[in-house]
Amino acid sequence: MALAEDLALLVRQEEVLQFKHFDEDVAWQLGALLQRRAEAEGWLVVIDIRRFERPLFLAARPGVTPHNHDWIRRKCNTVQRFLCSSYRIGHQLAIDQKDLTQRYNLSPVDYASAGGGFPITVQGAGVIGSVAVSGLPERQDHQAIIDALCTLLGHDRAALSLAPVGKFANAKGKVVAVSG
């Protein structure tokens, strides 16, 4: 999938994956979904769910490092700054052939334009927080969040999933490469 097509789907994910309400119990349910999958898959990840003013859920699998926690901080900062997914920002920047510093004068020490940070949006209220995963390749970090949100909110995962990175056969049977 080309960057522009990916970007359109990233925008669609944000439009569809919204909550009617969001509180500590919902944060716990979302975090538990992500934690159970991480455990089942053997993922070495950090999971962070927060309202912008405070953390609501934090889990770290054995083997993660402070580096993963720093990625979480930077991804959450990006979501809070732009009110959209960190992966969407990365795609917009890639299309424009810019980075965070060139486009927004933001330091990569504090912001990340990598997949794995997603806005928590409440219908009628807007973006109130973020969910972030760090420890997998960025596209997988992002997709883990999308899968959990689809499960929790009752949406079709296939309709909102990015194509996997790597080589695959397209609808015409031609093998194509997908970058993340």
UniProtKB/Swiss-Prot annotation:
Record-stated family: Belongs to the UPF0303 family.
Name of this chain's protein: UPF0303 protein PSEEN3311
Species whose genome carries this gene: Pseudomonas entomophila (strain L48)
